[in-house]
Design a protein with these regions (language model features):
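Polytopic transmembrane helical bundles with strong interfacial aromatic enrichment
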Residues: 1-184
Length: 184
């Protein structure tokens, strides 16, 4: 990835995730078309809207995580819950989120400032709080539908897995097992 633009690598990740989502959607449609299938579970309109919103939030979070990874910004914050000992560290959003640039370079051609890496990492971290809250709320609503309790358990388990592996990456200086687990 050293020779590729971070935007290209991140878009490649999102393309792979879109393919995975489409394959899963096709799998569910196939399962529901089987004879003897109980059919789809009806969800309240509010739960369906929240499901779509959480899907969108997760999609943005995956993009932000890809941006952290492709910019090698994971070690910009090496403490938790603060970053560099601050609740709001020095950040450079303009350079950190300039999409079309070479790896490690600002769009001006200069080296990417450390504050840009901090901005990339910290935005991913803060958005994780929003995503985690949305997933917890959705899991609670799904738990109230007996046919969706298994899905609710999976949702909680995956959210906790992402939180744990993300935290492990920060406090243990990016061990390979945690990095791979958080990515996949």
């Amino acid at each position: 990835t050293m020779k590729l633009f971070p935007a290209i690598v991140t878009l490649h990740l999102l393309g792979g995730m879109a393919l995975l989502a489409l394959l899963r959607g096709q799998s569910v449609a196939y399962e529901l078309s089987e004879p003897g299938s109980p059919g789809p579970t009806a969800l309240a309109a509010g739960t369906r809207r929240l499901l779509i919103a959480v899907f969108g939030l997760v999609w943005v979070q995956i993009a932000l995580g890809g941006w952290v990874s492709t910019n090698y910004a994971v070690l910009a914050c090496s403490d938790f819950p603060t970053c560099q000992g601050s609740w709001w560290p020095a950040m450079d959003f303009r350079h950190g989120f300039a999409l079309w640039r070479e790896l490690g370079m600002a769009h001006t051609g200069d080296a990417l400032p450390f504050q840009a890496l901090t901005a990339i990492h910290y935005v991913h971290r803060l958005s994780a709080v929003v995503v985690f809250a949305g997933m917890a709320w959705l899991a609670w609503l799904l738990w109230r539908v007996p046919a969706m309790q298994r899905s609710a358990r999976w949702l909680v388990g995956l959210a906790l897995w992402q939180f744990t592996t993300g935290l492990t990456n920060v406090v243990m200086d990016w061990p390979l097992l945690a990095a791979v687990s958080h990515t996949g």
